Regions:
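Hydrophobic alpha-helical segments within soluble ligand-binding/sensing domains
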Residues: 9-11, 17, 23-56, 75, ...
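Structured segments of extracytoplasmic/periplasmic soluble domains
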Residues: 39-50, 54, 82-90, 148-155, ...
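Hydrophobic alpha-helical
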Residues: 80, 104-106, 111, 116-120, ...
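Exported/periplasmic ABC-transporter solute-binding proteins
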Residues: 158-165, 175-248, 255, 260, ...
């Protein structure tokens, strides 16, 4: 976890500046969140002729929120709402609170968005969302998400056109409990192996955090520090063997002393490239 204030998300620069060899390696949470939202919007636009299950002109979605206080969960909820136009500003940022139930579009936490395709305008509405916390207090709970989709589907029926989740664990629980049998696209995050495989069965898509690039960055930063060479060696600058990462798979923020792997949308167009997690990442395999 990146050193930061758990309430505000402000980075702990004292920790990140501990010494000259201190760096953080992770993934760009905001870029991934935006990408998930864009992936969902693109899917809706590409499938607009069939996605509105009851033909009411409203593209209704439900949202499984992992943990209302977790930075990644907050970012992903905001990313979806931003892309779909359902976000409402709260103190300078999109409100990430769960809406509860909003079938009539009257909530003050979200608003109705719009999507225009082929000259026709459709309303986009967050029908319901909740934090998936179980009775023991565990968040990101898959079983709770499975129960939630059964409750939502019983109440909203064919108003639900899209299912969205902050991660694949909850997403796959909802997919297996209801979405798959009802041909409702479900979108998650993490590119878990079961979710990637499920794309062939109708799972809408997921986001890969480029774990291979994260692993390489971590090992490379350590290696460079131990070898006493420039920290960028084999990362943005080729090493003696020619290993180097391209700028479309990582970014470095000098002010934050942080390397971030860039996320990738995994959809029906490319999921086969992600089925085997043991494949060596070729650009840095020399």
């Amino acid at each position: 976890r990146q050193p930061s204030n758990s309430s505000t998300g402000e980075l702990d620069m004292t920790a990140l500046n501990f010494n000259e060899n201190t760096y953080y390696v992770g993934f760009d949470a905001n870029q991934g969140a935006e990408l998930q939202g864009t992936m969902i919007r693109d899917y809706i636009e590409a499938n607009i002729d069939t996605i509105d299950r009851n033909g009411d002109g409203i593209i209704g979605y439900v949202l499984a929120v992992g943990d209302i206080g977790h930075n990644d969960s907050i970012a992903r909820t905001r990313g979806v709402r931003s892309a779909l136009g359902t976000g409402v500003d709260a103190d300078g940022s999109i409100n990430s609170e769960p809406v509860g139930t909003n079938t009539d579009g009257s909530s003050s936490i979200v608003q109705d968005g719009t999507i225009e395709v082929n000259g026709q305008t459709y309303t986009v509405r967050e029908l319901a969302s909740q934090e998936m916390k179980n009775s023991a207090g565990a968040t990101w709970d898959a079983a709770t998400a499975g129960n939630a989709i059964n409750t939502w589907s019983a109440s909203f029926g064919d108003q639900i056109d899209v299912v969205v989740s902050n991660n694949d664990g909850m997403g796959m629980s909802m997919f297996n409990a209801w979405s798959k049998d009802n041909s409702v696209p479900t979108f998650g995050y993490d590119a878990n192996s079961d979710a990637v495989a499920a794309i062939a069965e109708g799972y809408g898509g997921t986001i890969s955090q480029h774990a291979d690039v994260q692993a390489y960055l971590t090992l490379r930063v350590l290696r460079n520090a131990l070898d006493g060479v420039d920290i960028d060696t084999g990362i943005g600058t080729p090493d003696e063997a020619g290993n180097v990462l391209s700028s479309d798979v990582f970014t470095y923020n000098a002010d934050e002393r942080s390397y971030y792997a860039l996320n990738v949308a995994v959809t029906a167009d490319n999921y086969q490239d992600f089925l085997d997690s043991t494949v060596v990442y070729a650009p840095v395999s020399n």
